[in-house]
A protein has these predicted regions:
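Hydrophobic, low-acid, alpha-helix-prone terminal segments
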Residues: 161-171
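Glycine-rich phosphate/diphosphate-binding loop of Rossmann-like nucleotide-binding domains
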Residues: 1-39
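An anion/phosphate-binding loop that grips the pyrophosphate of nucleotide cofactors and donors
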Residues: 60
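Short linear motifs in low-complexity or flexible loops
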Residues: 158, 172-178, 184-186, 190
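Short beta->alpha junction loops
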Residues: 38-48
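Short glycine-rich anion-binding loops that position phosphate/pyrophosphate groups of nucleotides
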Residues: 10-11, 68-71, 151-152
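Proline/glycine-rich low-complexity loops and linkers
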Residues: 76-157
């Protein structure tokens, strides 16, 4: 399967932060049998971001995005993904309730930027963030998979790794031509 990694955020293009996520994800995907054919970085511009996502969905089976899930004005990744897929962008009430509990436990006021974190592409499978507010998601559409994840490298490498390994275990079982059962060891390797 062909994979593409897209990192979002103008701060990457300005050189303000290091793009560790692409390197780590490329290594992980290649270890799990994917061919990472493209890595793209796009700034916080909704039209360019939507265009990049559309192009990726045409040429890759699995598209993983990194960034743009937080509670700031610049976090437009989820909306651009929904536009690229031609699917509605909707509020997930159960995610809003989880977020309200999360912010309340820290005594933080519930405001519009936090509410935006509860919006996802219609039909998305949420991957709750157990160590923060921004959840990731998986969107399966017309045989393609668009995966959105956190920008923070420590969340990706630790909390998210288990979820990602479970996701790839499922994909490996259903993406092989013989459709045979596969096993995943504690390091995520399949046989």
């Amino acid at each position: 399967m062909i994979a593409e990694i897209i990192t979002t955020g103008t701060e990457l293009l300005l050189g303000e932060i290091t793009n560790e996520n692409s390197q780590w994800l490329a290594s992980f995907l290649n270890e799990h049998g994917y061919t990472v054919a493209y890595m793209t970085t796009v700034g916080d511009n909704p039209d360019r971001m939507t265009s990049v996502f559309r192009q990726a969905l045409e040429r890759a089976d699995l598209v993983i995005t990194s960034g743009g899930l937080g509670a700031t004005q610049g976090d437009i990744t989820k909306q651009a993904g929904a536009r690229a897929l031609g699917l509605p962008f909707v509020k997930f009430p159960e995610e809003e309730q989880r977020l309200r509990r999360y912010y309340a436990q820290y005594g933080r006021k519930w405001q519009e930027p936090q509410e935006r974190q509860a919006w996802f592409t219609e039909g998305a499978e949420l991957l709750p963030n157990e160590n923060g507010s921004a959840s990731g998601c998986i969107v399966r559409h017309q045989g393609k998979i668009l995966r959105r994840k956190h920008k923070s490298s420590h969340i990706i490498k630790f909390d998210f790794l288990h979820k990602l390994q479970q996701f790839f275990k499922i994909l490996f079982c259903f993406s092989r031509k013989s459709y045979h059962q596969c096993r995943t060891d504690s390091h995520g390797h399949t046989d």
